[in-house]
Regions:
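Short beta-strands and strand-coil junctions in structured, solvent-facing domains, enriched
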Residues: 290-291, 414
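Short Gly/aromatic-enriched secondary-structure transition segments
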Residues: 105-109, 232-241, 292-301
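Non-catalytic, conformational "gating/processing" segments within enzyme and secreted inhibitor domains
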Residues: 115-289, 304, 308-391
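Well-ordered beta-strand positions in beta-sheet-rich domains
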Residues: 78, 247-249, 317, 414-419
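Detector for small/aliphatic-rich hydrophobic stretches
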Residues: 11-180, 409, 420, 424
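Sec-dependent signal peptide recognition
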Residues: 2-10
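Short, solvent-exposed amphipathic alpha-helical segments in soluble enzyme
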Residues: 298-299, 386-387, 421
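Extended hydrophobic
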Residues: 218, 268-284, 392-425
């Protein structure tokens, strides 16, 4: 296996089609693009009450669990996704939704706050995520978020929609001629994605996903690189991992860490910090033979209790496999099943974008790559589950399927999450 890149790339792409008619700044080293942008400046100090912040966090966790369960039913192996990335892209779309389309989206995405306060909460989260930790080398820790919207050339956009995007997401709209030249437009958008991911994801939109009916494309990219605060020794030996499909031998890291270790009924967990203490990886390992049941039984309350249980436990020993894999999935059916089918049909109402009901969602595409090694990552329980510290000796052996969460510590936001059922894949 080639040297791990220590990175995570999360990309969400959303395309909208028109029902008739033809109706961040330009990336470097590419031809300049025409950008439509509000005269409004980004709100750099959004006002979000503590109550709204708590509601926003709970809502996000609820959607992340819904998404996890939906992907679990359709993905047989390892998978990775980012609720933060998916929600941000769809929140930009939600800003233009109206009537029952908006109601369905709010229900499916767990957007319970009023629209103005919701967008302010997304803005506050984005600003918090992209604030670099003090006195930390960028080579050791980077977390970057980028949003872009691409619209049919000559397509009218309401000023209020542009204002919302500018003030809360720092985004404008790039013009492309999808109607006449869909392939060059697709190349331009894929080029933007490649720039944001340092060319690790060169083709977000494969041929055919953008065509002459496309009128609007939303893209959200998250780049994460984090060295472990305490790195594992190099040259990890092979060890057995009890995968769902049978035992495999995989490179397995052994290291002493000041990781938090804690446990509950049927599971053990660890939290490994990244340099700068801005983010941590939380690993949750269900008891042997209980992984499927643990996944199925997860609730917002039980998952909240698990994630809140991390506390310093002194020197600890963590034994875990190296792993790397990619996820590439269309979310159309998933989002429809979660309760927003109207957005994908001719009856969709995105009149908040252009003042007319002639847009619907064509595709929502999510791509992710993760690599975890000795250096770092560049990328069950009923309600009221009991949580307690693991007694000494403090050792967690991750030799069976597990869940992982990469959490932004200051906000508690889950940046990335997924499962590893076979690290050899």
């Amino acid at each position: 296996m080639r040297r791990a890149l220590n990175l995570i790339f999360l990309i969400v792409g959303v395309t909208l089609s028109g029902c008739g008619g033809s109706d961040g700044s330009s990336p470097p080293d590419r031809p300049p693009m025409n950008e439509l942008r509000s005269t409004k400046l980004r709100a750099t100090a959004p006002v979000v009450s503590s109550e709204d912040a708590a509601t926003f966090a709970t809502d996000n966790l609820a959607f992340s669990l819904d998404m996890y369960q939906a992907l679990r039913s359709s993905q047989s192996g390892n998978f990775l996704f980012s609720q933060a990335s998916i929600s941000t892209a769809l929140a930009m779309l939600y800003a233009g939704a109206a009537t029952s389309t908006a109601t369905q989206m709010a229900d499916a995405l767990h957007f319970s706050l009023p629209a103005t306060r919701l967008h302010a909460a997304f803005n506050a989260l984005d600003l918090a995520l992209t604030t670099p930790p003090p006195k930390t080398n960028a080579a050791a820790f980077r977390l970057e978020v980028a949003n872009s919207i691409w619209i049919q050339k000559g397509f009218s956009v309401l000023p209020v929609y542009l204002d919302t995007l500018a003030e809360n997401y720092g985004a404008g709209l790039f013009e492309e001629d999808f109607a006449a030249s869909p392939e060059p437009a697709r190349d331009a958008i894929n080029g933007w994605v490649a720039d944001q991911t340092e060319d690790q994801i060169p083709t977000l939109f494969p041929p055919g996903t953008i065509d002459t009916s496309t009128r609007l494309v939303l893209a959200n990219a998250v780049f994460f690189h984090g060295d472990w605060k305490i790195q594992f020794p190099k040259n990890s030996p092979n060890a057995i991992f009890h995968a769902l499909s049978g035992d495999v031998f995989v490179p397995t890291m052994h290291g002493d860490h000041n990781a938090a270790l804690w446990s509950g009924a049927g599971w053990n967990a660890a939290a490994l910090d990244y340099v700068g203490d801005t983010a941590s990886m939380i690993i949750v390992v269900p008891d042997a033979g209980t992984f499927a049941g643990f996944e199925t039984s997860l609730t917002v309350e039980s998952l909240s209790a698990i994630l809140a249980g991390a506390r310093p436990s002194g020197t600890s020993n963590v034994i875990m496999p190296r792993f790397s894999f990619a996820t590439d999935v269309s979310l159309n059916d998933t989002l429809s099943a979660l309760g927003m089918p109207e957005a994908f049909g001719d009856g969709a109402d995105f009149s908040g974008i252009n003042g007319a009901r002639n847009l619907h969602v064509q595709s929502v595409i999510h791509k992710a790559i993760i690599a975890v090694d000795e250096k770092g990552t560049t990328a069950s329980a009923a309600t009221g589950v009991g949580v307690g510290l693991v007694s000494a000796p403090a050792t967690l052996i991750v030799d069976r399927p597990f869940l992982f969460f990469i959490r932004h510590n200051a906000t508690g936001a889950i940046l990335f999450q997924g499962r590893v059922v076979d690290p050899s894949k």
